[in-house]
Design a protein with these regions (language model features):
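Short, surface-exposed beta-strand/strand-loop-strand elements in extracellular ectodomains
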Residues: 53-64
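Short beta-strands within extracellular/lumenal beta-sheet-rich domains
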Residues: 20-39
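Structural recognition of the beta-strand scaffold that forms the well-ordered cores
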Residues: 124-128, 133, 169-173
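A short beta-strand element within beta-rich, extracytoplasmic domains
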Residues: 39-52
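Short, well-structured beta-strand segments within conserved domains
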Residues: 44-46, 75-105
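Conserved SGNH/GDSL esterase-like catalytic core that processes O-acyl groups on lipids
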Residues: 32, 99, 138-188
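Exposed low-complexity, polar/acidic, P/S/T/G-rich flexible segments that act as propeptides
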Residues: 96-125, 129, 142
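Short, small-residue-biased leader/transition segments that mark boundaries at the very start
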Residues: 1-8
Protein backbone atom coordinates (compact mmCIF):
# COMPACT_ATOMS: atom_id res chain seq x y z
CA UNK A 1 0.00 0.00 0.00
CA UNK A 2 1.32 3.43 -0.96
CA UNK A 3 0.11 6.88 0.05
CA UNK A 4 -2.97 8.81 -0.92
CA UNK A 5 -1.50 10.76 -3.86
CA UNK A 6 0.04 8.63 -6.59
CA UNK A 7 2.03 9.76 -9.56
CA UNK A 8 2.08 7.44 -12.52
CA UNK A 9 4.07 4.29 -11.77
CA UNK A 10 3.81 1.09 -13.77
CA UNK A 11 3.93 -1.01 -10.61
CA UNK A 12 0.63 0.37 -9.35
CA UNK A 13 -1.33 0.58 -12.60
CA UNK A 14 -1.93 -1.56 -15.64
CA UNK A 15 -1.77 0.59 -18.76
CA UNK A 16 -3.76 -0.40 -21.85
CA UNK A 17 -3.09 0.63 -25.42
CA UNK A 18 -0.13 2.32 -27.04
CA UNK A 19 0.77 5.09 -24.65
CA UNK A 20 3.90 6.50 -23.11
CA UNK A 21 5.27 8.19 -20.01
CA UNK A 22 6.78 11.66 -20.27
CA UNK A 23 8.05 13.59 -17.24
CA UNK A 24 6.05 11.30 -14.94
CA UNK A 25 2.82 11.87 -16.87
CA UNK A 26 0.95 9.23 -18.84
CA UNK A 27 0.08 10.23 -22.40
CA UNK A 28 -3.15 8.64 -23.62
CA UNK A 29 -3.79 9.48 -27.25
CA UNK A 30 -5.51 6.52 -28.91
CA UNK A 31 -9.10 5.48 -28.37
CA UNK A 32 -9.56 2.88 -25.60
CA UNK A 33 -6.22 3.78 -24.02
CA UNK A 34 -6.72 3.38 -20.31
CA UNK A 35 -5.58 2.18 -16.93
CA UNK A 36 -6.54 -0.25 -14.19
CA UNK A 37 -5.86 0.84 -10.61
CA UNK A 38 -6.27 -0.99 -7.36
CA UNK A 39 -7.05 1.29 -4.43
CA UNK A 40 -8.31 1.37 -0.87
CA UNK A 41 -11.07 3.73 0.13
CA UNK A 42 -14.46 5.10 -0.80
CA UNK A 43 -13.35 7.73 -3.33
CA UNK A 44 -10.86 7.97 -6.20
CA UNK A 45 -9.91 11.07 -8.18
CA UNK A 46 -7.80 11.46 -11.30
CA UNK A 47 -6.12 14.66 -12.46
CA UNK A 48 -5.67 14.92 -16.19
CA UNK A 49 -5.06 17.45 -18.91
CA UNK A 50 -7.23 17.14 -22.03
CA UNK A 51 -6.54 18.81 -25.37
CA UNK A 52 -10.30 19.11 -26.02
CA UNK A 53 -13.66 18.16 -24.54
CA UNK A 54 -13.96 14.37 -24.56
CA UNK A 55 -15.28 11.37 -22.62
CA UNK A 56 -14.08 8.55 -20.39
CA UNK A 57 -15.85 5.42 -19.26
CA UNK A 58 -15.23 4.30 -15.67
CA UNK A 59 -15.66 0.68 -14.58
CA UNK A 60 -15.65 -0.04 -10.84
CA UNK A 61 -14.96 -3.53 -9.46
CA UNK A 62 -16.93 -6.07 -11.56
CA UNK A 63 -19.14 -3.54 -13.39
CA UNK A 64 -19.17 -4.32 -17.12
CA UNK A 65 -21.32 -1.39 -18.33
CA UNK A 66 -19.36 1.43 -16.72
CA UNK A 67 -20.28 5.08 -16.28
CA UNK A 68 -19.68 7.72 -18.94
CA UNK A 69 -18.00 10.88 -17.65
CA UNK A 70 -17.41 14.11 -19.57
CA UNK A 71 -13.86 15.51 -19.64
CA UNK A 72 -13.30 19.24 -20.19
CA UNK A 73 -10.48 20.91 -22.07
CA UNK A 74 -7.53 21.83 -19.83
CA UNK A 75 -6.26 20.44 -16.53
CA UNK A 76 -8.85 19.29 -14.02
CA UNK A 77 -9.39 16.77 -11.24
CA UNK A 78 -12.29 14.32 -11.70
CA UNK A 79 -13.93 12.24 -8.98
CA UNK A 80 -14.32 8.95 -10.82
CA UNK A 81 -15.52 6.87 -7.87
CA UNK A 82 -17.28 7.98 -4.70
CA UNK A 83 -19.60 6.56 -2.07
CA UNK A 84 -18.10 3.09 -2.38
CA UNK A 85 -18.03 0.68 0.53
CA UNK A 86 -14.86 1.12 2.57
CA UNK A 87 -12.28 -1.38 1.39
CA UNK A 88 -10.28 -2.44 -1.64
CA UNK A 89 -11.49 -1.70 -5.16
CA UNK A 90 -10.46 -2.06 -8.79
CA UNK A 91 -11.17 0.74 -11.22
CA UNK A 92 -10.68 0.92 -14.97
CA UNK A 93 -10.62 4.29 -16.71
CA UNK A 94 -10.93 4.16 -20.51
CA UNK A 95 -10.59 7.06 -22.97
CA UNK A 96 -13.53 6.50 -25.31
CA UNK A 97 -12.96 9.51 -27.59
CA UNK A 98 -10.94 9.25 -30.80
CA UNK A 99 -7.38 10.54 -31.01
CA UNK A 100 -8.17 13.25 -33.56
CA UNK A 101 -10.85 14.62 -31.19
CA UNK A 102 -8.77 14.74 -27.99
CA UNK A 103 -5.58 13.55 -26.32
CA UNK A 104 -4.96 13.24 -22.57
CA UNK A 105 -2.10 13.59 -20.13
CA UNK A 106 -2.85 11.75 -16.87
CA UNK A 107 -1.00 13.51 -14.05
CA UNK A 108 -1.98 11.80 -10.79
CA UNK A 109 -4.50 9.74 -8.84
CA UNK A 110 -5.79 10.38 -5.33
CA UNK A 111 -7.34 7.85 -2.89
CA UNK A 112 -6.79 6.55 0.63
CA UNK A 113 -4.09 4.21 -0.69
CA UNK A 114 -2.98 2.16 -3.70
CA UNK A 115 -1.95 -1.47 -4.18
CA UNK A 116 0.35 -3.08 -6.71
CA UNK A 117 -1.57 -4.15 -9.79
CA UNK A 118 -1.77 -7.86 -10.60
CA UNK A 119 0.00 -9.21 -13.64
CA UNK A 120 -1.58 -8.38 -16.98
CA UNK A 121 -2.95 -11.11 -19.19
CA UNK A 122 -0.43 -13.02 -21.27
CA UNK A 123 -2.86 -12.80 -24.21
CA UNK A 124 -2.14 -9.61 -26.14
CA UNK A 125 -4.40 -8.34 -28.92
CA UNK A 126 -3.96 -5.39 -31.24
CA UNK A 127 -6.78 -4.02 -33.38
CA UNK A 128 -6.13 -1.73 -36.34
CA UNK A 129 -9.09 -0.14 -38.05
CA UNK A 130 -11.25 2.79 -38.97
CA UNK A 131 -14.55 4.18 -37.67
CA UNK A 132 -16.04 0.79 -36.79
CA UNK A 133 -13.05 0.06 -34.57
CA UNK A 134 -13.03 3.59 -33.12
CA UNK A 135 -16.71 3.67 -32.10
CA UNK A 136 -17.69 6.39 -34.57
CA UNK A 137 -21.29 7.40 -33.79
CA UNK A 138 -22.05 4.02 -32.19
CA UNK A 139 -24.49 5.58 -29.67
CA UNK A 140 -26.42 7.54 -32.31
CA UNK A 141 -28.98 6.71 -34.96
CA UNK A 142 -27.85 5.80 -38.46
CA UNK A 143 -28.90 9.25 -39.70
CA UNK A 144 -26.99 11.15 -36.95
CA UNK A 145 -23.77 13.03 -37.63
CA UNK A 146 -20.81 11.79 -35.60
CA UNK A 147 -20.01 13.75 -32.45
CA UNK A 148 -17.94 13.02 -29.36
CA UNK A 149 -21.27 12.65 -27.52
CA UNK A 150 -22.53 9.78 -29.70
CA UNK A 151 -19.20 7.98 -30.13
CA UNK A 152 -17.90 5.43 -27.62
CA UNK A 153 -14.98 3.09 -28.25
CA UNK A 154 -15.93 0.89 -25.28
CA UNK A 155 -18.92 -0.32 -27.34
CA UNK A 156 -16.86 -1.61 -30.28
CA UNK A 157 -16.04 -5.17 -31.28
CA UNK A 158 -12.37 -4.50 -30.52
CA UNK A 159 -12.85 -3.41 -26.91
CA UNK A 160 -15.60 -5.96 -26.18
CA UNK A 161 -13.54 -8.82 -27.67
CA UNK A 162 -10.52 -7.91 -25.55
CA UNK A 163 -12.69 -7.79 -22.41
CA UNK A 164 -14.42 -11.09 -23.19
CA UNK A 165 -11.03 -12.76 -23.71
CA UNK A 166 -9.50 -11.03 -20.65
CA UNK A 167 -6.69 -9.80 -22.90
CA UNK A 168 -4.20 -6.98 -22.77
CA UNK A 169 -5.09 -4.87 -25.79
CA UNK A 170 -4.19 -1.98 -28.03
CA UNK A 171 -6.44 -0.19 -30.52
CA UNK A 172 -5.13 1.92 -33.38
CA UNK A 173 -8.20 3.39 -35.07
CA UNK A 174 -9.09 6.59 -36.88
CA UNK A 175 -12.44 7.29 -38.49
CA UNK A 176 -12.17 7.74 -42.25
CA UNK A 177 -8.63 6.39 -42.42
CA UNK A 178 -8.45 2.69 -43.06
CA UNK A 179 -5.58 0.43 -44.01
CA UNK A 180 -6.31 0.25 -47.75
CA UNK A 181 -8.49 3.03 -49.23
CA UNK A 182 -8.96 6.04 -46.93
CA UNK A 183 -11.75 8.55 -47.48
CA UNK A 184 -9.25 11.40 -47.10
CA UNK A 185 -5.52 11.77 -46.58
CA UNK A 186 -3.00 8.92 -46.41
CA UNK A 187 -3.91 5.47 -45.17
CA UNK A 188 -2.35 3.70 -42.21
Amino acid sequence: LVGSEMCIRDRYINIYGRSYLSDGKLKLDHTTNGVDLFFKGETLSVTLKASANSYMRVFIDDDTEGRRLAVSIGTKSYVVAQGLEAGNHKIRIVKITEMQDATWEVQSFSAEGFFAAPAKSELKLEFIGDSITAGYGVLGKQSDQKTIMNSDASKTYAYLTAQKMNADYSVIAWSGICTKAPLWGPGM
